[in-house]
Regions:
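N-terminal secretory signal peptides that target proteins for export/translocation
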Residues: 1-4
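Acidic, low-complexity intrinsically disordered segments
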Residues: 6-7, 11, 18, 23-154
Length: 154
């Protein structure tokens, strides 16, 4: 009987210790998706990039790439760059489950090109890393007016 009591007490102590152990938080899953706009040479075009998650987001940092012979980056929400690369960086504790970035380009040449995610990192509102699945934007550029193309500021 003493042996059974020791086993039961040992088992209960182990159960109590397990309750106090910290849990490893699993990463939040999110998607980084883009609009697929159509435009013409010389015109400005807006590509919308949107990060959506089941949990509230806090921080997104991304590097995007694009073909600088087809598109010229003009401006964007929390975005800087040019020459084929854009950096997006936003830290917003009140963002909720989505963050949206509007990126403005000028179309330079006919054809189809893309804006793609080269690298992306995210943190949810609990400080946990977000696993982000990335897509890309397909931008269709039709014939247009090359005289509208503005030279980049140097």
């Amino acid at each position: 009987m003493k042996k059974v009591k020791k086993i039961i007490v040992s088992f209960l102590l182990m159960c109590m210790l397990c309750v106090g152990m910290t849990c490893v938080a699993s990463a939040t899953a999110a998607e980084f998706r883009f609009s697929d706009p159509q435009t013409s040479v010389g015109a400005e075009v807006e590509v919308t990039a949107k990060v959506s998650s089941a949990k509230a987001l806090n921080t997104i940092q991304a590097t995007l790439s694009y073909d600088k012979t087809k598109l010229r980056f003009i401006s964007g929400d929390d975005a800087t760059g040019g020459d084929g690369t854009i950096t997006i960086s936003r830290n917003d504790e009140n963002a909720g489950t989505t963050m949206e970035f509007n990126l403005k380009f000028q179309a330079l040449d006919e054809g189809t090109t893309s804006v793609e995610v080269a690298k992306v990192d995210g943190i949810d509102s609990n400080g946990v890393a977000v696993e982000i699945t990335s897509g890309s934007s397909s931008v269709s550029i039709a014939e247009g007016d090359k005289s509208l193309i503005q030279e980049e500021d140097t």
